[in-house]
Curated annotation (Swiss-Prot):
Disulphide bridges, residue numbers: 89-104, 96-110, 103-121, 107-131, 112-119
Gene Ontology molecular functions: neuropeptide hormone activity; type 1 melanocortin receptor binding; type 3 melanocortin receptor binding; type 4 melanocortin receptor binding
UniProt key word Iron: no
Stated name of the protein: Agouti-related protein
Amino acid sequence: MLTTMLLSCALLLAMPTMLGAQIGLAPLEGIGRLDQALFPELQDLGLQPPLKRTTAERAEEALLQQAEAKALAEVLDPEGRKARSPRRCVRLHESCLGHQVPCCDPCATCYCRFFNAFCYCRKLGTATNPCSRT
């Protein structure tokens, strides 16, 4: 029973190959291009030829590539950029580790944790501090 079922499955799987193959050709010899197939009735369902681009589309694509190249060159060229003015303070919740500038908020202080490995500007609220959160 099992052998009959296995033989039937093998025949069903091999049937399309036997019916569609051309006599005297190996399976890959009949395919000259990607849009050709061994099965002539299925040739119309294959890959469509690529669409031809108009000159306007080509010009637009060239302009986009030039604009991208120019933008990339501006980003990567540090000499072409303006020099940034040094920041005079560190904002709240930003890292103040290694900075010699104070926090922007006068009520904030540079708060360090984990053996001074993680420091950031934070408002510390205490009862004696006039800037405490209430």
